[in-house]
Amino acid sequence: MLKHLKQVDQEVFEAVSKEFKRQQEHLEMIASENYTSYAVMEAQGSVLTNKYAEGLPHKRYYGGCEYVDIVEDLAIERLKKIYGAEHANVQPHSGSQANQAVYFSQLQAGDTIMGMSLAHGGHLTHGAKVNLSGIVFNAVQYGVNPETELIDYDQVYKLAKEHKPKMIVAGASAYSRIIDWAKFREIADEVGALLMVDMAHYAGLIAGGAYPSPVPYADFVTSTTHKTLRGPRGGFILSKAQYGKDIDKWVFPRLQGGPLMHVIAAKAVAFKEAMTEEFREYAHQTVKNAKVLAEELKAEGLRIVSGGTDSHIVLVDLRPLNVKGNQAEEALGRANITVNKNAIPFDPEKPMVTSGIRLGTAALTTRGMKENDMRRIAKNIVKVLKNLDNEKIIQEVKDDVLSLCSSYPLYPEWTEYYLD
């Protein structure tokens, strides 16, 4: 394994090897990251990368697709079974492209959409001005209540009544609480809007029964496959049957060309894994870990946005320690704890500075970590945040992190190949 890469391109091999070591020796706490299984990576690295397969299964524009058809059929049927969906398209290369396909399948340029503000925890593709969704469409943004820091459903209702959007978008990238999908459906119905849910962050938790499913309520559900779902990097779309043909033609040929069949194979494997009892246990443990992490950080003097979490996400307000998000990200990185700076609702700081950090427990849980490990990690995080420039303290934390990581080895079967 990797011997050919090492022989052909030493520079790339060395970069890959160093990244393998970084993943082994760091606590991965970026909420959108996770570790795929050996099987998922083997599927993605298979000969399917050589095959063009424009079109849909059994309706291809190329010959020789009989075996990739089997793979895509498996991915579609497994995905529909996991979420109880009527229609599924597994070809989107990313969550962003999945969202674009839904928008363009139903909307015209200039139509009004409503999505959660990026500044309050939404995603770029939900109508942010710098994104295509906010350029092509008239985007109205809702947010959280300043007191509770929970989605302000009264505001959502008022904005919907005022602006009459053709589509309402629910879902977020930095919102830790349960989203009331039924409430969004009720509001959408009242104003005659379609409802799209972007469940990218929560998809794995939903598959494992640890977070409510939006599928019974939404006309369209989009997602990535690589966050809590633990698959390869990619996307998918679920929809009511009546929208299936529109979705399919907007994914191909209107937005994409040939699907990535090696990635679709990896998606199929990940979907099979997501139907196991082991995956269900992982999903519930991920939420348990996040709750313990949040409580421990609160006990150490930090403020948790909204007061806690119902998911894998913990959004931390650093202002009680007079620390900025970019400072925290950099210092924690020196201690081998990988996080990302993140705006908090009503943040006075600039986006590249921020007053907060976003933490996630999915990758740690995949490694096998549990509640006591979260308590240990929380104490180390706070120790760094209180000693940003104390290299002795940061080294002590790094040593403890290395010890913890060694107790939960990552890809042990591959170590000799990557670190040869």
Swiss-Prot record:
HAMAP family to which the protein is assigned, alphabetical: SHMT (MF_00051)
N6-(pyridoxal phosphate)lysine carried by residues: K227
Role, per record: Catalyzes the reversible interconversion of serine and glycine with tetrahydrofolate (THF) serving as the one-carbon carrier. This reaction serves as the major source of one-carbon groups required for the biosynthesis of purines, thymidylate, methionine, and other important biomolecules. Also exhibits THF-independent aldolase activity toward beta-hydroxyamino acids, producing glycine and aldehydes, via a retro-aldol mechanism.
Binding site for (6S)-5,6,7,8-tetrahydrofolate: L118, G122, H123, L124
Pathway participation: One-carbon metabolism; tetrahydrofolate interconversion; Amino-acid biosynthesis; glycine biosynthesis; glycine from L-serine: step 1/1
InterPro entries for this protein: PyrdxlP-dep_Trfase, PyrdxlP-dep_Trfase_major, PyrdxlP-dep_Trfase_small, Ser_HO-MeTrfase, Ser_HO-MeTrfase-like, Ser_HO-MeTrfase_PLP_BS, SHMT-like_dom
GO biological process, one term: glycine biosynthetic process from serine
Cofactor (UniProt): pyridoxal 5'-phosphate
Reactions catalysed, as given in the entry: (6R)-5,10-methylene-5,6,7,8-tetrahydrofolate + glycine + H2O = (6S)-5,6,7,8-tetrahydrofolate + L-serine
Subunit structure: Homodimer.
Predominant cellular place of this UniProt entry's protein: cytoplasm
Site, Plays an important role in substrate specificity: residue positions: H226
Family: Belongs to the SHMT family.
Keyword set, alphabetical order: Amino-acid biosynthesis, Cytoplasm, One-carbon metabolism, Pyridoxal phosphate, Transferase
Gene Ontology cellular component annotations, sorted alphabetically: cytosol
N-terminal signal peptide: none
Protein's cellular compartments: Cytoplasm
EC number, as in UniProt: 2.1.2.1
Coiled-coil features, chain-numbered ranges: none
One MF annotation (Gene Ontology) recorded for this entry: glycine hydroxymethyltransferase activity
Name of the protein in question: Serine hydroxymethyltransferase
